Amino acid sequence: MSQQKQQSWKPPNVPKCSPPQRSNPCLAPYSTPCGAPHSEGCHSSSQRPEVQKPRRARQKLRCLSRGTTYHCKEEECEGD
């Protein structure tokens, strides 16, 4: 009887814990990289506007391949 309880107690614990844990880590990394790396990249571009002008097009291509990343970076760079 105790074995059945242990087995039935583990399965519900794993699925219940995995969805929330996956959601939280996913949300944090997405928002953090979107703000920090992008602002840094855009800041460095503002330091070298002449050199970054041609490179901006390449950066956009790289951002596009990433998907959601390009949206964040585009807003940051456009605001520049």
Curated annotation (Swiss-Prot):
<keyword id="KW-0417">Keratinization</keyword>
<comment type="function">
    <text>Precursors of the cornified envelope of the stratum corneum.</text>
</comment>
<feature type="region of interest" description="Disordered">
    <location>
        <begin position="35"/>
        <end position="60"/>
    </location>
</feature>
<feature type="compositionally biased region" description="Polar residues">
    <location>
        <begin position="1"/>
        <end position="10"/>
    </location>
</feature>
<comment type="similarity">
    <text>Belongs to the LCE family.</text>
</comment>
<feature type="region of interest" description="Disordered">
    <location>
        <begin position="1"/>
        <end position="21"/>
    </location>
</feature>
<dbReference type="Pfam" id="PF15858">
    <property type="entry name" value="LCE6A"/>
</dbReference>
<dbReference type="InterPro" id="IPR031716">
    <property type="entry name" value="LCE6A"/>
</dbReference>
<dbReference type="GO" id="GO:0031424">
    <property type="term" value="P:keratinization"/>
</dbReference>
<protein>
    <recommendedName>
        <fullName>Late cornified envelope protein 6A</fullName>
    </recommendedName>
</protein>
